[in-house]
Swiss-Prot record:
Gene3D superfamilies: E3 ubiquitin-protein ligase SopA. Signal peptide: none annotated. Keywords: Calcium, Cell membrane, Lipid transport, Magnesium, Membrane, Metal-binding, Transmembrane, Transmembrane helix, Transport. The gene is PLSCR. This is Phospholipid scramblase. It catalyses: a 1,2-diacyl-sn-glycero-3-phosphoethanolamine(in) = a 1,2-diacyl-sn-glycero-3-phosphoethanolamine(out). GO terms for biological process: adhesion of symbiont to host cell. PANTHER family: PHOSPHOLIPID SCRAMBLASE, PHOSPHOLIPID SCRAMBLASE-RELATED. Belongs to the phospholipid scramblase family. InterPro entries: Scramblase.
Length: 431
């Protein structure tokens, strides 16, 4: 009975001791959560694997201890996960970067951790010193124009204000003879302008099927006639156009003396007329039509009109001649080549309605002249005279249409052009 009381008292004492130790272990665990082994007296204790080293009952392993089979009952580190951890003092024991020298480096996951500019907001910018960090080429205003030192990269002729009009400084680019015409004409395609580069009137005339001849209105004659009441005759000017597309091909300019034109009969006065292809200067004509002063009476001393080629450095070369034989009631003309051989002639009556009563309407508007081959006597060309509405303002202004029909030789075509001009000058150019 006594032994039972002693054992009961001893059990109470052991129970109280265990409870105290349990409270101490709980406090230790709370401290170890912040500093796992900071206050652990056993961390450097070689007897740390002997949990009951300070237990006075260590020699009595079976002294009625209810936890006698629990080796950790008195172990203050029983809940310490680091009790057997050799790195218990290493704060990085659970740190996967324990061997990483940059464990405390906030940029440990930063691919630029070795970059001395890791704290530089421009670390990823190769132009970190460039204030235009978002635009690597921001200092280059020509980033979209790599050749901006050539400011006209996209427009090679940008500095040339005439980029769309390479010859814009030449106001007559589209109309080479603009100074000699009254109305602008559409510029032909390059294939039709090849003659301008060769500057050869033969090349211009060869493909033509016909020409339109328009006499230009001279306001000086109009003012002299209707304002001053004086009949003065000034030099004539003609435009020679392609009959198919109305494109200007030649310009004919008369250069006669004022006294001769106004004082001598038409058959007697000297004639000097220049025919120029477009783009040529007046001092470098293609064809020169000349007639000397002559004293012509009926069939005596009939005039001779000579045509010269001036295209070869202004060297005169005779192309042919035109002679008007005497006739009472008809228009007669003979055309001769350079060898003085008759090639074409015209013999038409002068009794046409448009000749007797010229008016710009009805059957009085047109006059027809037919040119024939000197050998076959077949018709090879047709000249039609047209009376324009300007006839009411200037009575001696006329237009002509010349169809070459069977004529292929460019020299013959030029002779027919000169003949048409001479016909208008002799018979229809009134003083």
């Amino acid at each position: 009975m006594r032994n039972q009381l002693v054992n009961a008292s001893l059990k109470k004492t052991i129970y109280a001791s265990n409870m105290i130790n349990k409270d101490q272990n709980q406090n230790t665990n709370q401290q170890n959560m912040r500093h796992p082994n900071m206050n652990n007296p056993n961390v450097n204790n070689p007897n740390m694997n002997y949990p009951n080293v300070n237990n006075p009952n260590m020699n009595n392993q079976n002294m009625n201890n209810s936890n006698m089979n629990n080796p950790n009952v008195n172990n203050p580190n029983v809940n310490n996960p680091n009790v057997n951890n050799p790195n218990v003092n290493n704060p990085n024991v659970n740190n996967p970067n324990v061997n990483n020298p940059n464990v405390n480096n906030p940029n440990v996951n930063n691919p630029n951790m070795n970059n001395p500019n890791v704290n530089n907001p421009n670390v990823n910018n190769p132009n970190m010193n460039n204030p235009n960090m978002n635009n690597p080429n921001m200092n280059n205003p020509n980033v979209n124009y790599p050749n901006m030192n050539i400011p006209n990269m996209n427009y090679p002729n940008m500095n040339n204000p005439n980029v769309n009009y390479p010859n814009m400084n030449n106001p007559n680019m589209n109309y080479p003879n603009m100074n000699f015409q009254q109305y602008p004409y559409i510029i032909p395609p390059p294939q039709q302008q090849m003659a301008m580069f060769f500057n050869d009137w033969r090349t211009v005339l060869a493909p033509l099927k016909g020409c339109r001849i328009k006499q230009q209105f001279d306001d000086r004659e109009f003012l002299a006639d209707y304002v001053m009441g004086m009949k003065f005759d000034f030099n004539n000017k003609y435009l020679i156009l392609d009959a198919g597309n109305e494109l200007l091909k030649f310009t004919a300019i008369e250069n006669s003396e004022f006294f001769s034109r106004n004082c001598l009969p038409k058959m007697c006065i000297p004639i000097n007329m220049k025919i120029l292809s477009y783009g040529k200067e007046l001092v470098k004509p293609d064809i020169m039509v000349e007639k000397d002063c002559s004293f012509t009476i009926c069939c005596l001393n009939r005039p001779i009109i000579k045509m010269y080629d001036f295209s070869n450095n202004n060297n005169k070369k005779l192309i042919g001649t035109i002679r008007p034989p005497f006739s009472c009631c008809s228009f007669k003309f003979d055309l001769f080549d350079a060898s003085n051989k008759k090639i074409i002639y015209m013999d038409d009556t002068c009794c046409q309605m448009s000749i007797l009563c010229p008016c710009p309407f009805g059957p009085f508007k047109f006059s027809n002249y037919y040119l024939r081959d000197a050998k076959t006597h077949e018709r090879i060309a047709h000249l039609r005279k047209e009376v324009p509405f300007l006839k009411f303002v200037k009575r001696d202004i006329d237009n002509y249409t010349l169809n070459f029909e069977d004529v292929q030789n460019p020299e013959w075509k030029m002779m027919l052009l000169a003949f048409s001009l001479f016909l208008d000058y002799i018979y229809y150019d009134a003083k």
